[in-house]
UniProtKB/Swiss-Prot annotation:
Annotated CDD domains: trimeric_dUTPase
Cofactor: Mg(2+)
Superkingdom to which the source organism belongs: Bacteria
Function description: This enzyme is involved in nucleotide metabolism: it produces dUMP, the immediate precursor of thymidine nucleotides and it decreases the intracellular concentration of dUTP so that uracil cannot be incorporated into DNA.
GO terms for biological process, alphabetical: dUMP biosynthetic process; dUTP catabolic process
Pathway recorded for this protein: Pyrimidine metabolism; dUMP biosynthesis; dUMP from dCTP (dUTP route): step 2/2
Name of the protein this chain belongs to: Deoxyuridine 5'-triphosphate nucleotidohydrolase
Length: 150
C-alpha cells in the first residue's frame, strides 16, 4: 500500500491545474508558477517563484525533492537556482522554486506555467561512529574514475 501525502492548495487557480502524475510510472508531479502576471527572468538572474502549494509531510521518513523540468533546462537554460530543492518533513508552508536563467536570452515565465517537478522520497538518517579504519573491500579508497571507462 502506498502512503498518501496531504498537499494543501493555496491558489484557487490551481483548481483547474492540480498537480497530477502523467502516467502510472511517473515519479514526479509538475509544479506551476503561481504568479499574478508574467515574470521576465534576465540571463544570469535568479527569482523566487511561488507554487501556490503548501506541504507538510510530517513523516520523518519522507522528504520532497524539487527538480528542474528537463525541457526548460535544455531548450531555455531555465534550471533551479539551488539545482535541487529539498523540503524537509517538518517544513510547513508554501513551496517556492528558485528559478535561475543560465541561458543567454531573457525568459518570460507565464502565470501557471510548469516550472519544476516534485518527487517524494524516503529518508534514512545516518548515525556516526569514530573509527580507526574500515574493513577492506575490493574497491578500497579508489574514487573519481577508479573503476575505469566504458
Amino acid at each position: 500500500m502506498q502512503a498518501v501525502i496531504d498537499v494543501k492548495i493555496l491558489d484557487a487557480r490551481l483548481r483547474d491545474n492540480l498537480p497530477a502524475y502523467a502516467t502510472a510510472g511517473s515519479a514526479g508531479l509538475d509544479l506551476r508558477a503561481a504568479t499574478e502576471e508574467t515574470m521576465t527572468i534576465q540571463p544570469g538572474e535568479t527569482q523566487l517563484v511561488p507554487t501556490g502549494i503548501a506541504i507538510h509531510l510530517s513523516d520523518p521518513g519522507l522528504a520532497a525533492m524539487l527538480l528542474p523540468r528537463s525541457g526548460l533546462g535544455h531548450k531555455h537554460g531555465i534550471v533551479l537556482g539551488n539545482l535541487v530543492g529539498l523540503i524537509d518533513s517538518d517544513y510547513q508552508g508554501q513551496m517556492f522554486v528558485s528559478v535561475w536563467n543560465r541561458g543567454q536570452q531573457p525568459f518570460r515565465l507565464e502565470p501557471m506555467e510548469r516550472i519544476a517537478q516534485m518527487v517524494i522520497v524516503p529518508v534514512v538518517q545516518a548515525s556516526f561512529n569514530i573509527v580507526d579504519d574500515f574493513d577492506a573491500s575490493d574497491r578500497g579508497a579508489g574514487g573519481f574514475g577508479s573503476t575505469g571507462r566504458g
